[in-house]
């Protein structure tokens, strides 16, 4: 080939790189502004020509706008007492008047109220008169107004009113009325449902996105061709060292696979799985637990991958495969690319390789084994670092362009993807030097244009089905509602790490602190020594720059969660390998320095063990010390390591003053040979042993590993092990004959201090009532305080769990007058023969009761025990022993709960049981109340709820219940759930209730207004003392059927917006 031909090819390639790069860049940047097709939805009422109520719960809670027209003739036809003409929420819903719009006729007046504000009001006689033709109502961004057309006020102006406040737009869960019969002419309500996020790309936008992606690829290929002009060949795509496997490879990969099966999950797995399962029906990736159903964009492409995976299965093992893949690839990149790049001393060091592998595992285990994006970010940051280093090593720009792409996509996963940007910044100056050197040969634009296209092509993914306006609105909502914390509150992230909670647990502390220790040690040594044989200073400093840069960038992320530390897993492992070499005898010749590092490492271990061995939610089941500090023989492990730290520190001080003429001793060399891989390996064994112990202690009931293994045979997670009483009135035992007192068999012969109404007012199931009601406080807002008809033993106290007072008696010791010691011994109740389907005896009780539980261990209180008896002479029952109950809610004295007594704890020849209750305290708060014992009829939650009924699964529980059907939403309207599944009481109160509250745009804003929730009796099979959570059955407040929406389509530009969603209370 001639020189002119080569020159011509270069010119063509330069033009291709420039033009394709600019096309890719321009089209990518234009993508957010290009038009989309919106699915429009309108709620019109009445429907079917009849006056009936319909439901249409809006995921955004409020509409874009609402108009209504009510003929005044309807008021004339109402009974004298009046009624609801129309409303957007059922009148008996929780805080209905505070949230919804009502048009109500009273005996004397007709009022239009919206969110507890009287918009307009007129006397009923005026409205019913001939002068009034209709009531017109409009609620838009401009405000809410109503007019009685035909009527005038004393000033002669049209009678009406209103307020120019966009926050008065009412919540809509449907349209409800007290009217019946055919719909009269002129009655109409029309609401524009907010479906701004339900969009698909137009043909123009789709073509632009495809062209942008193709142009970027062409530009990168052209850039690669220009890279060849230096005449040097890059190493092969798959180098030789990738083809060999070592013992460390086997150990690390086996560790990843083993942890994938038996290991703990991350905190937001249920949250993310819930979004992924709902996305297909919704048409976009909505954050439907909060924030008014707004999309996750611009940080959501990884969740869309998970949504695609749900089409195959929702099982945990399948859904978490991307994280397993990311972990294994991280290790392969570390061992084959990163460690050799850090220098021959690091690559050749077996301790360094093991340090990298063990630190990667121990950082991965607490943070990166779930559905959260940290493992993908860890992989993306490592790939970016590898590509930057390869670009510098070979003076090529194509790897740098690919690094820009990986950094952009890593940032597109979550704001914490800034770690990949930190990798770009760390390598920025060397890359700029390469760019300056190469532009003299091929020019500037052929090099810059592909880079621009590479950095912006992510926009075609982020804005594939959303627009700039919708993403800005979603960002506004998340920022306004929060959490959205300022940069100067970054200290909270580290503060949470030292608290004795799951966020500050043993595993999470080690996962981050080992990285921090290695980082600061390496910085100190590298600053002290200008040259270290076998260590490449440039890559080493850039690695440290990545970590420091990430710590800086994390300040600007809106949330300060500890789980974000999972993104350090890969770079932290590389830092551990580098530090292992830096603190080796080959570099630190004086054993004093190495012993000082060992002392620091032991101090870090003591700090790690100075907390609980806690894991998130169900992952902690059966794990030793999951709520206390680990101990050995009564001595905390933290104390052991702290003692070792003191010894090592004293030894280091002694070495400082001892003579160095005789060299270092064998003890010092042995202790300081490889402390990092040994410490990390020890911690990996601790974590694995914790999970294995949990499996053994929990079997045959639920544990993470057992659940994962059952998935191969179609298991349904926790739903297979949670037992539900469909009807708690079933299973009550027959009392044996005898003479009873005024309380009947429950009170026995001589009850003292107990009465049928001895319970405080408004005592509800499994809940605390605090006045005034606090956010996160669980209370039954609609529970009656007194029955209209007395129960079987004269009690008027409402019973929990659906218990029928006409069949179930009650006896309580509460009184407001003079206090006395109260005692009760019930009649003997005949116990059925034992079988596997009836493992429990249950007593529904309330008050301050002594009992045992997994969480609280033993709780002191008054006595409620179950006494069991054997057959005696003459047919009498002879007491044979007593059982203290499993009481899950012992710290909630004002709560009904089910006290559990395991049949397996009773002798095989037990034939009868009775309740023995004693309230010996004279303090009014120390009351107790009991009902008769029963042997409950139970079914698994999977059998009872099934996989087709819509369920509101709190964000914490989703991964544990993969077979239940989440409540879906489409075209801006949600399904109406039949049940709610919550986590344990503490998590429900502090986490899910507050996060999903309607004030924050959560799903509870819908269910609270539209439904009533009733707690059901549930138990975790063979783990009777554990609070797994709760199942709540929803009951509709109003008789209504789902509304039919009027759907359509509209083409919208990228900057079109129907206005801000109402997010203020």
Curated annotation (Swiss-Prot):
Protein name as it appears in the record: Probable arabinosyltransferase B
Protein source organism: Mycobacterium avium
Membrane protein topology class: Multi-pass membrane protein
A GO term from the CC aspect: plasma membrane
Coiled-coil ranges from the UniProt annotation: none
Function text: Arabinosyl transferase responsible for the polymerization of arabinose into the arabinan of arabinogalactan.
Recorded family membership: Belongs to the emb family.
Transmembrane domains' residue ranges: 15-37, 204-226, 241-263, 394-413, 417-436, 441-463, 510-527, 540-557, 567-589, 596-618, 633-655, 667-689
Main location: membrane
Documented EC number(s): 2.4.2.-
Compartments in which it is found: Cell membrane
Keyword Membrane (UniProt): yes
Single GO term (MF): arabinosyltransferase activity
Top-level enzyme category: transferase
Keywords assigned by UniProt, alphabetized: Antibiotic resistance, Cell membrane, Cell wall biogenesis/degradation, Glycosyltransferase, Membrane, Transferase, Transmembrane, Transmembrane helix
InterPro entries: Arabino_trans_C (IPR032731), Arabino_trans_C_2 (IPR042486), Arabino_trans_central (IPR007680), Arabino_trans_N (IPR040920), EmbABC_dom1 (IPR027451)
GO biological process: Actinobacterium-type cell wall biogenesis; cell wall organization; response to antibiotic
């Amino acid at each position: 080939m001639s020189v002119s031909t080569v020159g011509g090819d270069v010119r063509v390639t330069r033009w291709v790189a420039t033009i394709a790069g600019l096309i890719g860049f321009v089209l990518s940047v234009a993508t957010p502004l290009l038009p989309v097709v919106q699915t429009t939805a309108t709620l019109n009422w009445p429907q079917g020509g009849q006056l009936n109520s319909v439901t249409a719960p809006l995921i955004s809670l409020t509409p874009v706008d609402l108009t209504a027209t009510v003929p005044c003739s309807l008021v004339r036809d109402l009974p004298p007492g009046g009624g609801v003409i129309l409303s957007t929420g059922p009148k008996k819903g929780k805080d209905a008047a505070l949230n919804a719009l009502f048009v109500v006729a009273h005996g004397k007046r007709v009022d239009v109220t919206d969110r507890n504000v009287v918009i307009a009001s007129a006397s009923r006689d005026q409205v019913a008169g001939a002068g009034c033709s209709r009531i017109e109502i409009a609620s838009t961004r401009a405000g809410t107004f109503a007019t009685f057309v035909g009527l005038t006020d004393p000033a002669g102006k049209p009678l009406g009113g209103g307020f120019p406040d966009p926050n008065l737009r009412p919540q809509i869960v449907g349209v409800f009325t007290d009217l019946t019969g055919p719909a009269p002419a002129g009655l109409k309500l029309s609401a524009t449902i907010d479906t701004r996020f339900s969009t698909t790309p137009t043909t123009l936008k789709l073509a632009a996105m495809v062209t942008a992606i193709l142009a970027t690829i062409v530009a990168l290929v052209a850039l690669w061709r220009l890279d060849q002009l230096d005449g040097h060949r890059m190493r092969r795509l798959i180098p030789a060292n990738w083809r060999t496997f070592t013992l460390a490879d086997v150990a690390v990969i086996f560790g990843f696979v083993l942890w994938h099966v038996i290991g703990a999950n991350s905190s937001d797995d249920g949250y993310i799985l819930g979004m992924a399962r709902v996305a297909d029906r919704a048409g976009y990736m909505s954050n439907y637990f909060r924030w008014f159903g707004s999309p996750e964009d611009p940080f959501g492409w990884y969740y869309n991958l998970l949504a695609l995976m749900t089409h195959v299965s929702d099982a945990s093992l399948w859904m978490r495969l991307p994280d397993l893949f990311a972990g294994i690839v991280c290790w392969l990149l570390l061992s084959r690319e990163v460690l050799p790049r850090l220098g021959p001393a690091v690559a050749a060091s077996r301790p360094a390789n093991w340090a990298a592998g063990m630190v990667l595992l121990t950082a991965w285990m607490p943070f990166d084994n779930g559905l959260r994006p940290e493992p993908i970010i860890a992989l993306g940051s490592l790939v970016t670092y590898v590509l930057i280093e390869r670009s510098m090593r070979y003076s090529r720009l194509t790897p740098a362009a690919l690094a820009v792409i990986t950094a952009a996509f890593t940032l597109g996963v979550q704001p914490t993807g800034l770690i990949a940007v930190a990798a770009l910044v760390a390598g920025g100056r060397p890359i700029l030097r390469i760019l300056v050197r190469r532009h003299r040969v091929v020019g500037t634009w052929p090099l810059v244009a592909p880079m621009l296209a590479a950095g912006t092509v992510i926009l075609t993914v982020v804005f594939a089905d959303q627009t700039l306006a919708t993403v800005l609105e979603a960002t506004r909502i998340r920022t306004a509602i929060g959490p959205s914390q300022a940069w100067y509150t970054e200290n909270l992230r580290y503060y949470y790490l030292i608290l004795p909670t799951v966020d500050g647990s043993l595993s999470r502390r080690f996962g981050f602190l080992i990285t921090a220790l290695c980082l600061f040690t390496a910085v100190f040594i590298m600053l002290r020594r200008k040259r270290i044989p076998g260590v490449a200073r440039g890559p080493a400093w850039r690695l440290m720059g990545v970590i420091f840069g990430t710590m800086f960038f994390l300040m600007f992320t809106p949330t300060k969660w500890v789980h974000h530390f999972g993104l350090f897993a890969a770079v932290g492992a590389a830092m551990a390998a580098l530090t292992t070499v830096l603190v080796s005898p080959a570099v630190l010749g004086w054993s004093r320095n190495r012993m000082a590092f060992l002392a620091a490492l032991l101090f870090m271990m003591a700090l790690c063990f100075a907390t609980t061995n806690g894991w998130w939610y169900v992952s902690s089941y059966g794990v030793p010390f999951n709520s206390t500090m680990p101990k050995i023989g009564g001595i905390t492990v933290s104390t052991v390591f702290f003692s070792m730290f003191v010894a090592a520190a004293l030894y280091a001080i002694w070495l400082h003053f001892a003579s160095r003429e005789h060299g270092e001793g064998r003890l010092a060399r042995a202790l300081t040979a490889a402390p990092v891989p040994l410490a990390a390996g020890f911690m990996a064994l601790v974590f694995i042993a914790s999970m294995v112990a949990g499996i053994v202690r929990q079997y045959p009931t639920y544990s993470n590993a057992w659940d994962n293994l059952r998935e191969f045979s179609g298991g349904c997670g926790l739903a297979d092990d949670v037992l539900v009483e469909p009807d708690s009135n079933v299973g009550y035992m027959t009392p044996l004959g005898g003479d009873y007192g005024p309380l009947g068999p429950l009170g026995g012969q001589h009850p003292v201090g107990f009465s049928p109404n001895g319970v405080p007012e408004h005592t509800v199931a499994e809940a605390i009532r605090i006045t005034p009601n606090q956010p996160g406080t669980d209370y039954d807002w609609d529970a009656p305080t007194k029955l209209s008809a007395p129960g079987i033993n004269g009690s008027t106290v409402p019973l929990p769990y659906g218990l029928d007072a006409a069949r179930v008696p009650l006896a309580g010791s509460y009184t407001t007058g003079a206090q006395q010691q109260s005692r009760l011994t019930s009649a003997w109740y005949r116990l059925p023969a034992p079988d596997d389907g009836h493992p429990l005896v249950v007593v529904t009780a309330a008050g301050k009761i002594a009992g045992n539980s997994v969480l609280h261990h033993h709780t002191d209180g008054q006595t409620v025990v179950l006494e069991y008896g054997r057959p005696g002479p003459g047919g009498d029952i002879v007491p044979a022993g007593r059982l203290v109950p499993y009481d899950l809610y012992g710290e909630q004295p004002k709560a009904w709960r089910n006290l559990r007594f395991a049949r397996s704890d009773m002798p095989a020849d037990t034939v009868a049981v009775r309740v023995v209750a004693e309230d010996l305290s004279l303090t009014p708060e120390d009351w107790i109340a009991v009902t008769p014992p029963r042997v409950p009829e139970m079914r698994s939650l999977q059998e009872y709820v099934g996989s087709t009924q819509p369920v509101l699964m709190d964000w914490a529980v989703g991964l544990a219940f993969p077979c239940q059907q989440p409540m879906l939403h489409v075209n801006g309207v949600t399904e109406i759930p039949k049940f709610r599944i919550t986590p344990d009481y503490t998590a429900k109160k502090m986490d899910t209730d507050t996060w999903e509250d309607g004030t924050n745009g959560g799903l509870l804003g819908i269910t609270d207004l539209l439904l009533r929730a009733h707690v059901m009796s549930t138990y975790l099979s063979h783990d009777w003392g554990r609070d797994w959570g709760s199942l709540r059955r929803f009951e509709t407040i109003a008789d209504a059927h789902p509304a039919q929406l009027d759907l359509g389509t509209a083409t919208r530009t990228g900057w079109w917006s129907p206005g801000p969603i109402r997010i203020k209370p």
